[in-house]
Regions:
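Phosphate-binding/catalytic loops
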Residues: 97, 103-165
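Intrinsically disordered, low-complexity regions
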Residues: 2-4, 62, 142
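Conserved active-site segments centered on acidic
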Residues: 12-94, 159-165
């Protein structure tokens, strides 16, 4: 899934990443804010635009789930001002990478954004040594496990990009 990677050396180009889950209140905002934190700490904020969205309309306008908010706060990461938004067809042209959390998200993303001719749509753990779904903590209640998987995947992905600068 690394065959379409953008060259960070091009001037004035930001890598645009959209993380996607079912409701945009647990996993995708967790990935959004973890990646923003990692990018900031690496001094690369000017080179990335990072956001998140939902495949469903169920939570649109709602804030981040308290479990995600609490877990991220443990690491000094704030999600203030984040409200659930839905994935739009126009997002395909706007983002370089559209990253889902599980196969159900992936199916819905491909339905909503047909013809992925630029190979933009992936699962977050596609970049890990053990590609798989990230379970939804809305159901599992395990925000710790979700945080660990999301953080490791975001770290690996960011390192991969930095190695190619």
């Amino acid at each position: 899934c690394w065959d379409k990677v953008l060259n960070l050396e091009r001037k004035n180009y930001m890598i645009k990443i959209l993380f996607v889950c079912h409701g945009n209140i647990c996993r995708s905002p967790m990935a959004e804010f973890v990646m923003k934190d990692l990018v900031k700490k690496a001094g690369l904020s000017d080179e990335f635009y990072i956001a998140s969205a939902a495949t469903s309309t169920e939570e649109i306008g709602n804030g981040v789930h308290y479990g995600t908010r609490k877990k991220l706060a443990e690491f000094g990461i704030s999600v203030d001002g984040k409200y659930a938004v839905q994935l739009k067809k126009s997002d395909y042209a706007k983002y370089d990478y559209i990253i889902g959390m599980d196969s159900y998200n992936l199916r819905n993303m491909k339905r909503m954004l047909p013809n992925d001719t630029e190979n933009k749509i992936h699962l977050l753990l596609d970049w890990s040594d053990n590609p798989r779904d990230i379970a939804d903590p809305w159901y599992t209640g395990d925000f710790e496990e979700t945080y660990n998987l999301v953080t490791a995947a975001c770290q690996d992905w960011l390192q991969w990009i930095r190695d190619r600068q």
